[in-house]
């Protein structure tokens, strides 16, 4: 639907069209033209595109929407986008309706169990990530020995892991959770192969996610890569 969508989807989609996310009017016109009344959002559009100056300028409808916002936090922007769709008779559904099967239940997901130190860091990191999410800033925290190494903001999960992992000098624990007031229609927390690759690069040792509320994309590849690199993953 928007820039960044994998091209492979063309092969499995009944209809495929790439539209720059800044072109809100075009997105709505396309959906209405196809008589779409229900949508489910998949993936994430980073706010970085609003500030980089390297992307297509927003259309009149997007400018009007952005100008009406009290702030540009994730929830404020996404709720406004959902409301704009609703004005046109388009309902946005809960992402978990289709993706519940890739949200793991509580437990250790990898072959290696966490150490006592990692367990303590996972509990600490989980709490810190929840607090960060409560401020609607990010969903990821990197910790070591109950000290916060990095908090996710606009840079995204992978950059946060790289920054925090380097500061930790190895054996960091990454926590990724849903916000306390998470709206399941958009921006559900997700981890994937790139998450593990980032952890490998900085020699992070553990990942804790929120059970039943975090998506694992390409689960088999994620767990295999984690096992190969002695990374422990826990759904808490």
Identify the meaning behind each predicted range.
Residues 44-46, 147, 179-180, 213:
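Active-site-proximal loop/turn and secondary-structure-junction residues that shape catalytic pockets
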Residues 5-7, 47-49, 99, 149, ...:
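Short, active-site-adjacent cap segments at secondary-structure transitions
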Residues 3-8, 83-93, 97-109, 231-234:
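Catalytic domains of riboflavin
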